[in-house]
Amino acid sequence: SYDRVKKLIRGLLPGKLKLPSLVQDDVFHMTELGLYFSRSSNGVSRLHEKVAQDQFKWKKIKHITNGVHHIYWMAGSFKDFYDVHLDGWRSNPELLLQVDQIPSPLIYAVHNENKKKLIAYANSQSSKALDPEVLTIGFARRAATYKRAHLIFHDMEKLLDIGQGNLQIIFSGKAHPKDMGGKSIIRNIVQSAKRFDGKIKIIYLENYDMWLGRLITSGVDLWLNT
């Protein structure tokens, strides 16, 4: 609240910064405070830059597009595959745009090898007996409330109608030890999975780390974003 913020930071702010300008509906606007004290500010895409600049006209905002290092995050089997079919892709990642020119069966063959590795590991950690022939959905990231890992269970009847016998889901991710909300989400997923026993196979893999993250992302058929 505004009153609490005044007690905490009064005397620490520059004289030309008017505290009331950072208050909206008696709630302190942390974003504006952060922008004021930042040397530079950026969005994560060109569109994000435009939206943020329209919202905060007094602050110059640029953009740095989110992305990944294509070599680091690609499964080793696909690196070898693209070395054969897209020569030069390592130094010129735009060549990956030509992936649709590679016959699909060849791509599926490599993917299925990665999928078998994932399913083998998952089955070594669970008694659910996941099937490598079934569409596999993956969701693996830090268990924070805003990431909404449990959103897929919002309509259980619809999920059951769509997924019974047709899909299986692999979850993974850790919550901060003091993040009670994050731990509650993990608990919610595990409990929800039990309600689908015998209908849809759902597992939550423990001890999430970079190795497991790579195994899941390279092995699932569909990556779930919420």
Regions found by a protein language model. Give the residues of each.
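Catalytic cores of carbohydrate-active enzymes across secretory and cytosolic contexts
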Residues: S1-T226
